[in-house]
Amino acid sequence: MDLLGLKELDNNKLVSKAKENGVEFSDLFLLSSGYLRDRENASASVSSKNERMVLNEERQNCWTKRNDPKGLTYYQLLKPSEVEILSRPETRRKRMACQVFFLNYYISTIEYHKLRKERLEEFTACTSSLKQSKQKRLWKEHCGRERAFLRKKRTKIQCSHFDLLVKLGQGGYGSVWLAKKRNTHELLAMKMMKKSTLQQLNEVKHILNERDILTNTNSEWLVKLYYAFQDKEKVYLAMEYVPGGDFRTFLTTKGLLHENQTRFYLAEMVAAISAVHKLGYMHRDLKPENFLIDQKGHIKLSDFGLSTAIVTSNQVNRLQHALVSAVNPQRPYLTQKQRRNIYKALLEKNENKVNSVVGSPEYMAPEVVYGKKYDRTVDYWSLGCICYECLVGYPPFSGSTLQETWTNLYYWREMLQRPSKNENGIYDKKARSVSDEAWSFITKCLTEPTSRFQSTIEIQKHPFFKRLHWNGLRKRAVPPFVPRLENQLDTSYFDDFNDEQVLDAYKDVYEKQRKAEQKAKSNGVMNGNQRQFLGFTFKYRPNARKPLVGRHREKRQLRKEKPEKKNNSTKQKDLITVSHNKGTTAIEDLDEDKRSKTKGHKTKSSRVHRLLERKGKDLYEFLL
């Protein structure tokens, strides 16, 4: 609310009277001066006694008594029904999205005016010694660049601004593509989802939740979101491209991991989980598929659709029904080797690609399935399952069928067995087994909620990580695996959707998507409810947007000190990538060097003109 609104609100009679009576208001936005003014006008126009009584009763109902956690009592000028509407999660999300939208709008506007003023001062300083005719010509070009930037700033982000290069993945309601933004040549992972399918599968909240989490974080352990936009049919999430594939592919290729390797990856997973918990969220769907490996071999966490407590009652009922139906089946005894072979066979058949209704049962905590209250410790349960799989070769509660997996989860206390234990309960020392520290960590994760780790600090103090330096995991530690990439467009660590075997493995996923689209079409839901996607649009804004005046001088100074050899000249095709921090393309620097070498000596006016043109182009590209 602006100062004028606050002044008007303070001068309002009802508010002044309420202040005299000692009434405290928790939120000025809930006190609409227009609403109060309408009430005053209404009371002035009332003539009969009955109408006055009705109006007074209605006015009393508008004051809702509220108690905050600190025990203070305050009143809000809202009806109970209006308070109930405001307390809904979707209303709170829309209100927050509205606030974030206007904050970003005013911040970007203020920064633009600040940078435009700096550019004007620089232009004036560089052209003050030129002739008036040349000043007019340069001024006209300067204004043209400013107008071009403003026009480009008003342009909405569209799918046509990106080139879809390679398909990276396919889900039940959308697909993921490697895309390149045309004006900046950024390589991004574009997630495309149909609105009608999302609404039919009740996945709208999951997508909105993922968008909200990604826009609130700037952690190096979480995948970064650059753009979120929509059209009439689809919604789009343009995220950071992580070329090393997911941790599931790495596990399938490597099989069993040594404890040193497991310790490294678990430590980075703990750091990623801690970043999510600091935002006030629970991931709830941790599994190897959601951890990605970047080009340097480090871990990044993705897929936040099931984060925090947003599971619907229907989904919980389905899970409870599946769990109850799996209470009394016959469970034949299987050795560790047999269970490992069965799980490998399931991975080869790709039967887990469609198995994500509300998380993965192999990694879900029992209290989530029971429908009980749970906290962030459910993520530590999933972490223990991943640790067990890294060391043993399969999740601790996996089965040959989904029904058997539910059964194992129900009897989790009996199914959790230390590896290399035979039928007689004797450990074989010659076999490859889990160390005492690792098993202590696993059992500390896979236990009752009150007995689990309660924070990441407790995990860091566990003996399993005693030889690990937590500070500087990304800088000091050397990853066990670093992806070998031929170029930036290398997608060899993802499924090749031109291969018939891969398409055959995803046939159930395509069938699920086709049925959802047909059902949405039969129900008359073509483009989905557009109101559900309000506040979805997002555009990444760097933390520091400073003009690039000094950086050009630093670049020229570096070129003078360290001239490049002709034999090691950089190719233009390798210089297309844009740095998000610097905002300039290397291809422009290369072209500038070529022009300076070929044209030779130039006059002072031409050098000033070229300098202003280049700085303006780089700066506008950086701001966009």
UniProtKB/Swiss-Prot annotation:
The encoding gene: ppk35
SUPFAM superfamilies xrefs: Protein kinase-like (PK-like) (SSF56112)
Name by which UniProt lists this protein: Serine/threonine-protein kinase ppk35
Domain Protein kinase: 162-465
Protein EC: 2.7.11.1
Compartments where found: Cytoplasm; Nucleus, Nucleolus
Record carries keyword Transferase: yes
Comp. bias (Basic and acidic residues): 560-574
Family: Belongs to the protein kinase superfamily. Ser/Thr protein kinase family.
Residues binding ATP: L168, G169, Q170, G171, G172, Y173, G174, S175, V176, K191
Chain spans, region Disordered: 545-617
Catalytic site: D285 (proton acceptor)
Compositional bias annotation for Basic residues: 545-559, 596-609
Domain of life: Eukaryota
Gene Ontology cellular component terms for the protein in this record: cytosol; meiotic spindle pole body; nucleolus; nucleus; prospore membrane; spindle pole body
